[in-house]
UniProtKB/Swiss-Prot annotation:
A GO CC term attached to the entry: cytosolic small ribosomal subunit
GO molecular function: structural constituent of ribosome
InterPro entries named in the record: Ribosomal_uS2, Ribosomal_uS2_bac/mit/plastid, Ribosomal_uS2_CS, Ribosomal_uS2_flav_dom_sf
Keywords, ordered alphabetically: Ribonucleoprotein, Ribosomal protein
This protein's name: Small ribosomal subunit protein uS2
Length: 257
């Protein structure tokens, strides 16, 4: 059993250290900013590394106790990656528009999920007894529901822990989690408010390579938790070749308070 391994070199290669343009920053991110280069804030990866490791351990521990992890990322570049990571690790996801009340009005959401299940059953039987037009309408309804709720169809209840890409875009999800006392792990870019989440991880939340790296690590942490829960042997997920060191940090000016 082992948590997924990663190196600072991998974070650099994925562009995790690149923040937003300096004029688009949130001053609350000052403690997590190493400096700036060409009017771009550079994130302090020396802080990202331990915070990411702690978050991975939390995911593994939560799953090992039988808890459910909800992956949330509805922006275009995160959508497919989020779904793949959740599916690969037997967890749950929201990768289309977050529907208000997805957590705080779970009863209503559950009714919609039951409707989705019913449509699945009807269409699996080739919608016998329905006209062609009625079948098309049923298929459209199912597609719409599946896009919104397919990733949480089997969740059964609200999650025990939420992992979020882009706290600005997913603010409603964060507020609902707060109301229910559900802890939130989130990637916080230099334009985000780190105070909004329980477990902030400073990092680029826009680059596909960075998002892929985060999601892969968290999926593997969840799988480690499943292995621990089942009492199985873990798989050594380290032993990856170091990526070249990005020279950007050598030419970075310190950020002013």
């Amino acid at each position: 059993m082992a948590l997924p391994d990663f190196t600072m070199h991998q974070l650099l290669e994925a562009g995790v250290h690149f923040g937003h343009q300096t004029h688009r920053w949130n001053p609350k991110m000052t403690p997590y900013i190493y400096g700036q280069r060409n009017n771009i804030h550079i994130i302090d990866l020396a802080q990202t590394v331990p915070l990411l490791h702690q978050a991975l351990k939390l995911v593994s521990d939560t799953v090992a106790r039988g808890g459910r992890i909800l992956f949330v990322g509805t922006k275009r570049q995160a959508s497919d990656i989020i779904a793949d990571a959740a599916n690969r690790s037997a967890q749950y996801y929201v990768n289309a528009r977050w529907l208000g009340g997805m957590l705080t009005n779970w009863k209503t959401i559950s009714n919609s999920i039951q409707r989705l299940r019913k449509l699945d059953k009807i269409l699996a039987a080739e919608a016998q007894g329905f006209t062609k037009k009625e079948r098309l309408n049923l298929e459209r309804d199912r597609e719409k529901l599946n896009r919104a709720l397919g990733g949480i169809k089997d969740m059964g209840s609200v999650p025990d822990l939420i992992f979020i890409i882009d706290t600005n875009k997913e603010n409603i999800a964060i507020q609902e989690a707060k109301r229910l006392g559900i802890p939130v792990i989130a990637i916080i870019d230099t334009n985000c408010d780190p105070d909004n989440v329980d477990h902030p991880i400073p990092g680029n939340d826009d680059a596909s390579r960075a998002i892929s790296l985060y999601c892969d690590l968290f999926a593997r942490a969840a799988l480690d938790g499943i292995a621990r829960q089942q009492g199985a042997m873990g798989i050594d997920l380290g032993a990856q070749a170091d990526a070249p060191v990005d020279p950007v940090l050598e030419n970075t000016a310190p950020v002013s308070e």
